[in-house]
């Protein structure tokens, strides 16, 4: 299977994964890695725009919302919507209602998965415990923030020092990162996280 970084497939972000780059003012790095492939479900945009404009750790919600508007309006990312009665729309509601394995998923996660399944494309989410069972069932590729950054450094598309500073910002902005710093993520990485149901045969371990 083609690695996510060499693929032409669109990448559908949930709110948390996009937030790792948005709240740290690193959307342009994301564009550098996925130029022309960034897809943001409408539900994710709504969740972000509904956040109250109060100051965070050095980066305000209002500034982030403005950055997202500009990112989309200048064509660096595409917002994707679901038509009423479409396969994506029906699948989205199935996931939100918990009709897949009895677990209700968030609207951003559900939208990213529904689009990734029927586009088709790649799901970008850090909530492995929520998305991996679904991706296993339908043979979907997925990536996390960790995987994107490690692979980007490995392929010389992102400098190690830049990745280290980005990770620090993510931790400062209270993103739920699986490692305390990028060096730990780099050292602990032993295999790709872009997997399919056909190749994944080990117990699920959340980051």
Residue ranges and their predicted role:
Residues 123-126:
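Acidic beta-strand-to-loop metal/phosphate-binding motif
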Residues 129-132, 150:
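Positions that flank functional sites
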Residues 138-141, 159-160:
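Short low-complexity, flexible loop/linker segments enriched in glycine and/or proline
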Residues 151-159:
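Short, flexible loop segments at boundaries between secondary-structure elements
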